[in-house]
């Protein structure tokens, strides 16, 4: 399964925020600079992450963005569920004439479930804790 760039950059943005001290705010501009992604694209991603509670956004002069909850409580599977369209096939009887007898959708759904269960066994904190190479690459002190 390949994640969309939306989910990929959502995970990267969360990893960046998780690598910062818990009370430190960052900005969308800073995140886009670190990853070289379009600001407009990142704004949409951060808005979605904010809607589901993974990011807190504060407006104003001293505003910015930061994790909406502790990194150790954010499971990677939950992030993917919030950002990724998880339907792998378009099973519509007008589109595919084998839909009534097809078993492929069930197998694919089980594969997605297994994938998400594996991601659920890892948190955002697991991605950043004791990872000095990551901090160096992200230029985080």
Curated annotation (Swiss-Prot):
Name of the featured protein: HTH-type transcriptional repressor NsrR
Keyword S-adenosyl-L-methionine among record annotations: no
GO CC, alphabetical: cytosol
Function comment: Nitric oxide-sensitive repressor of genes involved in protecting the cell against nitrosative stress. May require iron for activity.
Keywords annotated in UniProt: 2Fe-2S, DNA-binding, Iron, Iron-sulfur, Metal-binding, Repressor, Transcription, Transcription regulation
GO molecular function annotation: 2 iron, 2 sulfur cluster binding; DNA-binding transcription factor activity; double-stranded DNA binding; iron ion binding
DNA-binding region, residue intervals: 28-51
Domain of life: Bacteria
Ranges of residues in domain HTH rrf2-type: 2-129
Required co-factors: [2Fe-2S] cluster
One of the GO biological process terms: negative regulation of DNA-templated transcription
Cofactor note: Binds 1 [2Fe-2S] cluster per subunit.
Family annotation (InterPro entries): Tscrpt_reg_Rrf2 (IPR000944), Tscrpt_rep_HTH_NsrR (IPR023761), WH-like_DNA-bd_sf (IPR036388), WH_DNA-bd_sf (IPR036390)
Gene name as annotated: nsrR
Binding site for [2Fe-2S] cluster: 91, 96, 102
């Amino acid at each position: 399964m390949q994640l969309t760039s939306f989910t990929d950059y959502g995970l990267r943005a969360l990893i960046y925020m998780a690598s910062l001290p818990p009370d430190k705010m960052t900005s969308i501009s800073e995140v886009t600079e670190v990853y070289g992604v379009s600001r407009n694209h990142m704004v949409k991603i951060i808005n979605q992450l904010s809607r589901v509670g993974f990011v807190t956004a504060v407006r104003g002069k001293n505003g910015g963005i930061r994790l909406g909850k502790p990194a150790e409580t954010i499971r990677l599977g939950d992030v993917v569920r919030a950002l990724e369209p998880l339907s792998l096939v378009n099973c519509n009887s007008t589109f595919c004439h084998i839909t009534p007898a097809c078993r492929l959708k069930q197998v694919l759904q089980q594969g997605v479930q297994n994938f998400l269960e594996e991601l659920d066994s890892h948190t955002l904190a697991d991605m950043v804790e004791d990872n000095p190479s990551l901090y160096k690459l992200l230029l985080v002190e």
